[in-house]
Amino acid sequence: MSKSKKTTKKTTEEYIKEFFENLSIETSFEMEEAEEEIRLTLETQDSGMIIGYHGETLDALQLILALVLAKKQGAFKRVSIEVGDYKKNREEWLRKLASDAKEKAVSQSREVILEELKPWERRIIHLILAQDDEVVSESSGEGRERVLVVRPK
């Protein structure tokens, strides 16, 4: 690893540590930094507070941390935080949702609309169904009205 890469990673870790300290959240974390994304796995007693209602607080923290890091480092990277296995469990639920939507679309020969999904959740379902020969998925609508549509091919 080059010296500048090492320095950047250390600096990123320091900014993240400072971010959580400023919020009075005691946590330790592991960080993976890729070209377009920073992934954090948090260990904390405050996981419920960090996740919030339906993950809304977690989504907000990810965005705010990404913006803070972009301001400090001059480049925007998406931040993904895993805490209390929330995302892992949510992904398992999304896999089941995708499977059920596919089954319904194929068996009833009609489109199935999945509402109230966050952008990252729609992305996961799109990736799951992209490999499927029987259905196609697409997002439709704008903003909070955006839905995911699963239809037979």
Task: Give residue spans per PLM region.
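RNA-contacting regions in translation and RNA-metabolism proteins
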Residues: 1-153
